[in-house]
Each structure stands twice: as C-alpha cells, then as structure tokens.
Amino acid sequence: MEDVLDLGEAPSRRTGVKMGRRARAAQETQQETADVSRNQTGREGPPKPLRQGGWADDSSGPSKSTRRMTDDVEDSRLKQQSLDESDEGEDIPVIPDLEDVQEEDLALQVASPPSVQVNRVMTYRDLDNDLMRHAAFQSLDGDVDLKLLTKVLSPEPEVREENVRWDWDLLFTEVSSELITEWDVGKMEKEDMLKPSPLVS
C-alpha cells in the first residue's frame, strides 16, 4: 500500500505468481502501456503518422525530393530578384501620352484595285463606225445574216440617257403619286364591276 500512496511515482507491479501463456500476455501488454506512457511524458511526442497521398500523388519518393530541390532553387532566385528590384526603385516605367502615339487612320488608306486585263468593250460609236466601214461583213461566215439586226438598231443619241442626279424627296413624291393614281384606277375598276348592270328588256 505504501507504494500506491507515493505521489511522485507510478504504482508498482504486483509480484504475484501467475502461470500459463495468458499470464505472460497480460504482463507484456502492461509493459507496453507503461512504455507508451513514459514516451508521452518525455521529450519525444507520439510517432508521426505516415502521410498517404490520394490519386494526385502518384510520384515516387526521389522525384519528390528533386522537385523540392528545384522549388528551393526557384524560390531563392525569386527572392534575389525581388531584392534587386527593390534596390532599383528609381526606374519607374513611363506611360507615353496619347498625343505621342501616332495612330494610323485606316479610313484614309485605300487599297489599290487589282489589276486584271479585261478585253475592251466597244462603245456604240465604235460599233456604229465598224458597221459603216465594213458593210461587206454584214453576213458572218455565211451562216449569220446581220441585215435584220442593222435595220432595227437605234442610233446612239436615241438610246443614250443623260445622267440625272436623284433627289430623295423628289423621287419619293413621284413614286408615291404614281402609286396613288394606280390605286385610284384600281378602285374605280372594282366599283364598276360591282355595280349591277341595268337589265335590258
């Protein structure tokens, strides 16, 4: 009993004689619990659990260590650069003024048209002159007779129209007045058809 009342020490083991393998197993478990309690009160903490990675941690051990080494090297490089940059605080980048920047105005630039060789189209005057000069060629290859065509062709002054500049307001009033007259004529014709015709007796 004296051993149990001692406040500074752990209770001592009973020295009773036990027999059999069960007795030995009980003694071993008591020793293990005593060792664990001593380790917890000492400087050493509990053993660190092994970290097991998930699906993303598929890399092997040596590659992890090399990755850590490269990360450390990169960190040291970044730290050195940041220290150097803090020393060079005098060099502040200057943003240029809008007036200094010359913008190219694309509206003023005109693309050159493509150069394509096109056969020259003959004008009415050229055709008229050719027909007058070459009256013998009115029939081509003996199969095509152009006499009928030359009789029906109109002279150039009759066919040519003058270039008239269109005015939107004038054009709109002309078209609207034409449409109104057409609608009025159509209404008159419908009314005439709907009127009962007098019976002839």
Swiss-Prot record:
It is found in: Cytoplasm, Cytoskeleton; Cell projection, Cilium. Pfam families: IFT43 (PF15305). Coiled coil: none annotated. GO terms for cellular component: cilium; cytoplasm; cytoskeleton; intraciliary transport particle A. Residues 68-78 have a biased composition (Basic and acidic residues). Belongs to the IFT43 family. This is Intraflagellar transport protein 43 homolog. It comes from Xenopus laevis. The gene is ift43.
